[in-house]
């Protein structure tokens, strides 16, 4: 039988804090389970809810002005959530409520509340690029890679998009300007900043505080719309989280990276926003085409890829002086696949100080082999490259997360060979190594190519783990 803590002892400050928070005298079990949370609970209790309500209303007015909800509804939702613990008796749910309320109390003002105050002046830093001149070249390159055979029976795992994406995009544009040391963007929106003819959906971001930001944003959307918002963590995408509404519609996603990784990601500054250097993005696109699913996307909408490719080609031409004359030298580098052991050997001696690169298609095998080498100089760039790199005894060791396309039995398709070369060049860019000659040869190797059919492809590495999620409505955190 539950008993109340002894009321005859001297006044217990911790007891009073918990009692005030719960709106009732805690049971013995509640007291002993929650007493270590007393500091967080006190912060929640003294938190100025009126100021918080005002900030959410201002966020609504600026970014969600077309959402039909009243100021009183927003206030009621906020006050209801901050008193939810008074009607909750499950210890696990109480811990979840305390954790999420603590995030709002300690971070919301600095992360999203700040977006409501006057912004610094935007420093216009756009360069005029002649993208049109690259469109025909991009079309030729992409046409030679448009070799996927679409299986009409295959169910594609594309997400449904929430109607709130346009509102969140407006918020994200301001967020990227205010928090440009901790959040940068890549993908179609970043290229749109260079070329306004590019269409974009949601805004792709890398940040150093992804979980906190997404929790704050999820609550902002919940308080404004009244909808249940769910945060999901996908095991096979490293440090990735996504916000979806109660109907499983995609709102925004984010990859989290360490600050030291953020510091070395090549980036450029446009209108107070940092974007991943388009050179780096171009290499990632070349790497991406080794993935059979991406080639299927290319087959369905080549023009979408064409305008992006042309934009990045013009950027590297302008920035690095790349001459597109078909001079390819030793590109793509020679690649030999061991299908049984799932390792591709890339001959790199013509371009780099290490003579070859062993590319593993199974990450766990690479990790085991690195341990056997007893080498502690590996570089982990997290989701930026989806791989660890190690150079040991003039050999690079790395992991490749995409499929490997074959043009014949035991023969690496040139699309994948270029993807592997691009993967190595990502390392060179991240470590300030030499890459421009190799980049020039790689891009020129994509010119004037005939289509080569795909014979087969390797399967992607299967990632273990379970899905994690935060369900605000049900007070559940599973990670």
Curated annotation (Swiss-Prot):
A Pfam family found in this protein is Pox_polyA_pol_C
SUPFAM superfamilies named in the record = Poly(A) polymerase catalytic subunit-like
Q: Which domain of life is it from?
A: Viruses
Question: Keywords for this entry?
Answer: ATP-binding, Calcium, Early protein, Metal-binding, mRNA processing, Nucleotide-binding, Transcription, Transferase
Expression induction or repression: Expressed in the early phase of the viral replicative cycle.
Q: Which residues bind Ca(2+) 2?
A: 202, 204, 253
Group of enzyme by EC: transferase
Describe the protein's quaternary organization and the partners it interacts with.
Heterodimer of a large (catalytic) subunit and a small (regulatory) subunit.
Q: Which family does it belong to?
A: Belongs to the poxviridae poly(A) polymerase catalytic subunit family.
Q: What is this protein called?
A: Poly(A) polymerase catalytic subunit
- What organism is recorded for this protein? Monkeypox virus
Gene (UniProt): OPG063
């Amino acid at each position: 039988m539950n008993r109340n803590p002894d009321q005859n002892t001297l006044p217990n400050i911790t007891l009073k804090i918990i009692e005030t928070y719960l709106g009732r005298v805690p049971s013995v079990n509640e007291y002993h389970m929650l007493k270590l949370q007393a500091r967080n609970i006190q912060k929640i209790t003294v938190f100025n809810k009126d100021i918080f309500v005002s900030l959410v209303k201002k966020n609504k007015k600026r970014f969600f002005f077309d959402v039909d909800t009243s100021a009183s509804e927003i206030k009621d939702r906020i006050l209801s959530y901050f008193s939810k613990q008074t009607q909750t008796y499950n210890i696990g749910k109480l811990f979840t409520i305390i954790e999420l309320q603590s995030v709002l109390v300690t971070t919301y003002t600095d992360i999203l509340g700040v977006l409501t105050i006057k912004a610094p002046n935007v420093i216009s830093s756009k360069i005029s690029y002649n993208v049109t001149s690259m469109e025909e070249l991009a079309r030729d390159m992409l046409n030679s890679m448009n070799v996927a055979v679409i299986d009409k029976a295959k169910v594609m795992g594309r997400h449904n998009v929430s109607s709130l994406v346009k509102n969140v995009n407006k918020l994200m544009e301001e967020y990227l300007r205010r928090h440009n040391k901790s959040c940068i963007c890549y993908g179609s929106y970043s290229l749109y900043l260079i070329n306004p003819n590019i269409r974009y959906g949601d805004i792709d971001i890398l940040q150093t505080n992804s979980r906190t930001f997404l929790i704050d944003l999820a609550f902002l959307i919940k308080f404004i719309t009244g909808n249940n918002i769910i945060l999901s963590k996908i095991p096979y995408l490293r440090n990735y989280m996504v916000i979806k509404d109660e109907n499983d519609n995609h709102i925004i996603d984010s990859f989290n990276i360490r600050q030291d990784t953020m510091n070395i990601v090549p980036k450029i500054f446009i209108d107070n926003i940092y974007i991943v250097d388009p050179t780096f993005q171009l290499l990632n696109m070349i790497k991406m085409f080794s993935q059979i699913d991406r080639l299927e996307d290319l087959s369905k909408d080549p023009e979408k890829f064409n305008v992006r490719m042309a934009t990045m080609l013009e950027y590297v031409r302008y920035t690095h002086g790349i001459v597109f004359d078909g001079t390819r030298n030793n590109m793509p580098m020679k690649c030999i696949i061991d299908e049984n052991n799932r390792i591709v050997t890339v001959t790199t001696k013509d371009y780099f100080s290490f003579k070859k690169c062993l590319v593993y298609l199974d990450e766990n095998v690479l990790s085991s082999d690195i341990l056997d080498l007893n080498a502690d100089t590996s570089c982990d760039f997290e989701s930026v490259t989806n791989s660890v790199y190690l150079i040991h005894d003039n050999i690079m060791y790395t992991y490749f997360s995409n499929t490997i396309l074959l043009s014949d039995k035991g023969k690496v398709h040139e699309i994948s060979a270029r993807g592997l070369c691009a993967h190595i060049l990502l390392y060179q860019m991240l470590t300030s190594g030499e890459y421009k000659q190799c980049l020039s040869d790689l891009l020129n190797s994509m010119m004037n190519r005939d289509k080569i059919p795909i014979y087969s492809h390797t399967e992607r590495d299967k990632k273990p783990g379970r899905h994690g999620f935060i369900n605000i409505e049900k007070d559940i955190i599973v990670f």
